[in-house]
Amino acid sequence: MFTRNKKKRIFAAILIIGDEILSGRTQDTNTSFLAKWLNERGVQLKEVRIIPDKLNTIVHSVNLLRKKYNYLFTTGGIGPTHDDITAFAISKAFKKKYEYNKEAYQILERHYKDSYFNEARKKMAKMPRGAGLIYNPSSSAAGFYVKNVFTLPGVPSILQSMMSFVEQLIIGGEKVYSVTVQVHLPESKIGKDLGKLQKKFKDLSLGSYPFFQSGKIGTALVVRGYSEKRIQECKIILEKILKKIKKS
């Protein structure tokens, strides 16, 4: 069951692993999904990195990010091919033996009982010693977790199907609130006043995002923070500022 510590602020990072992402051959959609998923559970995504399938790079990145944030989610590199080295790299990062996980092996063995259970398929059961399994309802290959590092597949549909289990393993934090104000004004006319408002509300995050709608240029202004009251105070002032700009 998912639990939340409403008084604690929780932060996370995502490490996307794969040459295919860096080359542009495969488009990453996991970041958007995970960002929304985490935010809904009171976990703020603070950093996203995309790195190649290089052992030393993965080890270095995992060790850096797992110490910096409450949670680290890795995606990609746990399949059956020669360049799927994420599980081995995480074993190195934690200085744990890279070996077959008995339960993961048995799940794969049952799944492939009517076909050839070859070495490539067996490889998907290898992970750091003592790792916990992240069960996979879409296929037989499990993900795994070691301490605060959650290792997931790169295929979006499979990753998404596994998050209901991940939810039971994490503790959410203080809820982040947000409000959006849309206005048919370009960012250039708002920027100066928005900067002044941000200085006044240092405990909030103010962002501006341009859009083009019905032949008109506009800006979506998003106010985010932990205090719903402060957000509403900021919104009232923001709307007054925008009204004044539109009249000028």
Give residue spans per PLM region:
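Proline/glycine-rich low-complexity loops and linkers
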Residues: 60, 67, 85-173
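Glycine-rich phosphate/diphosphate-binding loop of Rossmann-like nucleotide-binding domains
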Residues: 5-48, 53, 229-232
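Conserved short beta-strand edge segments in small beta-sheet-based binding/regulatory domains
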Residues: 241-248
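Short beta-strand segments
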Residues: 15-16, 74-77, 134, 152-153
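Glycine-rich beta-strand-to-loop/alpha-helix junction loops that act as flexible
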Residues: 17-19, 74-82, 224-226
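N-terminal small/polar loop signature for handling phosphorylated ligands or for N-terminal nucleophile
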Residues: 32-85, 89-92
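An accessory alpha-helical subdomain
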Residues: 148-241
